[in-house]
Amino acid sequence: MHEMALCESMIEIIEREAREQQFSRVRAVWLEIGALGHVDPEAMRFCFSAVAHGGIAADARLEILEMPGAAWCMDCAKTVTIAQRDAPCPDCGGHHLQITAGEELRIRELEVD
């Protein structure tokens, strides 16, 4: 389960920001997860709870924002929304797509004290 390692890294980032920005508690974390990133939101919630236990984010809410996948179709020269990596262009059916969004995993916002 790679979500555990992702959450460990996320907590490290939050703790570093707490030292730099001088906050002592995290109330909420807004996390952007791309639809094409192979990250399970429910596994992230479970792992975040386990990794955050006893630390600065122990009681924090994890709000997950699922970001859609997008690609540039080289056949029809359009940006299109896609649900999976190997999907054809929904407009022209072409398979020459360059992923432009949906792979991200980003802490968007923290609510802190």
From Swiss-Prot:
Gene Ontology MF term list: nickel cation binding; zinc ion binding
Pfam (any one): HypA
InterPro entries: HypA/HybF (IPR000688)
Superkingdom, natural source: Bacteria
Binding site for Zn(2+): 73, 76, 89, 92
BP GO annotations: protein maturation; protein modification process
Family annotation (Gene3D superfamilies): 3.30.2320.80
Residue sites binding Ni(2+) per the record: 2
Keyword set, alphabetical order: Metal-binding, Nickel, Zinc
Keyword Phosphoprotein attached: no
Similarity remark: Belongs to the HypA/HybF family.
Function of the protein: Involved in the maturation of [NiFe] hydrogenases. Required for nickel insertion into the metal center of the hydrogenase.
Protein name: Hydrogenase maturation factor HypA
Lineage start: Bacteria, Pseudomonadati, Pseudomonadota, Alphaproteobacteria, Hyphomicrobiales
